[in-house]
């Protein structure tokens, strides 16, 4: 089968460092076009392409015949990868779906749960006839370490406790900080939403079915003046089984942590991107497995392309999964705004 013609929508840091290399790495896709806000940024992205010599450029300032709608009108482009600012992305997703293009859109699925629900409803209604697929790019669902840990967890019984700790400092010299839509966020949670959905997705490898979250109480704070509206959160999460755990995340802390620790009836697992440690019921380490660290983006793009070729969506990229990731964080934000008032989860899987 011939490679699928694809366009990259957006030319920011992630498109340069992750999406473009991922598209060029798989034989299942061929890059046909790039769209960006400015022609210069589209040119910058195209200039680093290694295996895509004939890429057409589109932008909002390129004039007649080179707008987003013109890209979507092309028959040789069947799919688009969209990586735009959180508030801007939904309208570009809707336009692509309306045009019958398969979509892989960066997380979060939308700025908030209400907008995400509307987007999913739009997709289901609009694409009944054209069959366009809608997938969300959550690369933490494609990291080998978390996949391995989740598979091992199946043999350990139900979850009894968990502790997620992701602590870091987004200082004002960080290149991601200097993207304007992140510096002055017009969406809930700021960096704690932008990054937080990654960490909720990783936690949800283990928190599913009877172990899915059912309620949360949280406190939130803005510690660093340059990270509005908040940069730190501490949440106690209750599961449907009645078990409880802690979800702790800060992008404004001088503490460093990046681990998902989960206790089960028959043992425990500590998962990190480069290592998984499995212990028995009395705490003895029974296995330590190392992994080469990967962002997971090349894996997720390849999985998406394979799903398009087969005509069967990859469940890991389902919009409903991304909706659950978003709800997990949004309820924490709402609880924090209400001084720790309990919030009920309704969309966990």
Which ranges hold each PLM region?
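C-terminal helix-rich "cap/oligomerization" subdomain common to oxidoreductases
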Residues: 50, 79-81, 124-129, 240, ...
């Amino acid at each position: 089968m011939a490679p699928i013609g694809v366009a990259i929508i957006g030319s920011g840091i992630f498109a340069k460092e992750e999406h473009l290399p991922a598209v060029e790495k798989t034989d299942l896709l061929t890059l046909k076009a790039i769209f960006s806000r400015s022609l210069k940024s589209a040119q910058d992205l195209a200039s680093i392409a290694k295996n895509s010599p004939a890429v057409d450029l589109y932008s909002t300032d390129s004039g007649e015949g080179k707008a987003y709608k013109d890209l979507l009108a092309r028959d040789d482009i069947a799919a688009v990868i969209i990586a735009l600012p959180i508030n801007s992305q939904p309208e570009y997703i809707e336009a692509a779906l309306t045009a019958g293009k398969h979509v892989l859109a960066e997380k979060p699925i939308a700025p908030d749960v209400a907008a995400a629900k509307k987007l999913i409803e739009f997709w289901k209604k609009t694409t009944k006839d054209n069959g366009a697929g809608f997938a969300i790019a959550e690369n933490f669902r494609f990291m080998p370490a978390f996949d391995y840990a989740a598979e091992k967890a199946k043999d350990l019984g139900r979850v009894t406790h968990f502790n997620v700790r992701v602590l870091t400092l987004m200082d004002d010299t960080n290149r991601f900080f200097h993207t304007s839509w992140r510096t002055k966020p017009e969406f809930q949670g700021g960096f704690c939403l932008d990054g937080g959905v990654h960490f909720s997705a990783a936690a949800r490898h283990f928190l599913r079915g009877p172990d899915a979250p059912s309620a949360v109480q949280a406190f939130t704070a803005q510690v660093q003046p340059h990270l509005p509206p908040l940069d730190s959160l501490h949440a106690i999460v209750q599961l449907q089984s009645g078990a409880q755990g802690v979800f702790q995340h800060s992008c404004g802390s001088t503490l460093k942590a990046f681990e998902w620790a989960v206790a089960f009836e028959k043992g425990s697992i500590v998962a990190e991107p480069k290592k998984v440690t499995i212990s028995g019921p009395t705490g003895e380490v029974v296995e330590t497995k190392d992994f080469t660290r990967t962002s997971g983006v090349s894996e997720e793009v390849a999985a998406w392309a394979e799903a398009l070729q087969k005509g069967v969506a990859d469940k890991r990229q389902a919009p409903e999964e991304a909706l659950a990731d978003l709800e997990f964080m949004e309820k924490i934000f709402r609880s924090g705004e209400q001084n720790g008032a309990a919030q009920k989860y309704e969309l966990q899987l």
